């Protein structure tokens, strides 16, 4: 009984990407943090749901902080050191996610707000009556 040898079993090499972009999409219900290279290829991402939060707790600043930490930890493995942050949305996790990225050792060079503003487009949802 001969043992079969695997031919061409090569280890996948990781690309070192020192500079990139961080996209923070902060809605009222969730926050999604995506770290990419300068071309837009995704290096790492995390959301409040993947950080272990469910339901209305996903919309909190603490959940956004934990999601940004998780994404930064994944991106640090591929050598990401410096990012430009692009923030989109009105959610409460905007500032918390940026502060968490800075605290996790990633150098933030610029912060841009790219929230889309309608020129009187779609009708907004009706007011809540509680």
From Swiss-Prot:
Signal peptide: none
GO molecular function, one term: rRNA binding
Gene Ontology cellular-component annotations: ribonucleoprotein complex; ribosome
Keywords (A to Z) from UniProt: Ribonucleoprotein, Ribosomal protein, RNA-binding, rRNA-binding
InterPro entries assigned: Ribosomal_uS11, Ribosomal_uS11_bac-type, Ribosomal_uS11_CS, Ribosomal_uS11_sf
Superkingdom of source: Bacteria
GO BP: translation
Protein role: Located on the platform of the 30S subunit, it bridges several disparate RNA helices of the 16S rRNA. Forms part of the Shine-Dalgarno cleft in the 70S ribosome.
UniProt family annotation: Belongs to the universal ribosomal protein uS11 family.
Assembly and binders: Part of the 30S ribosomal subunit. Interacts with proteins S7 and S18. Binds to IF-3.
Name of the featured protein: Small ribosomal subunit protein uS11
Species of provenance: Dehalococcoides mccartyi (strain ATCC BAA-2266 / KCTC 15142 / 195)
């Amino acid at each position: 009984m001969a043992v079969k040898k695997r031919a061409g079993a090569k280890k996948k090499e990781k690309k070192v990407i020192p500079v990139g972009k961080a996209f923070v999409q902060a809605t009222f219900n969730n926050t999604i943090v995506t770290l990419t290279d300068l071309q837009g290829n995704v290096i790492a991402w995390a959301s409040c749901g993947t950080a272990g939060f469910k339901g209305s707790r996903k919309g909190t600043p603490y959940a956004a902080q934990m999601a940004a930490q998780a994404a930064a930890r994944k991106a640090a493995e591929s050598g990401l050191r410096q990012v430009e942050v692009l923030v989109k949305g009105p959610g409460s996790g905007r500032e918390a996610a940026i502060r968490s990225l800075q605290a996790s050792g990633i150098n933030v060079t610029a912060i841009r707000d790219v929230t889309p503003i309608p020129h009187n487009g779609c009708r907004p949802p009706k007011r809540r009556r509680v």
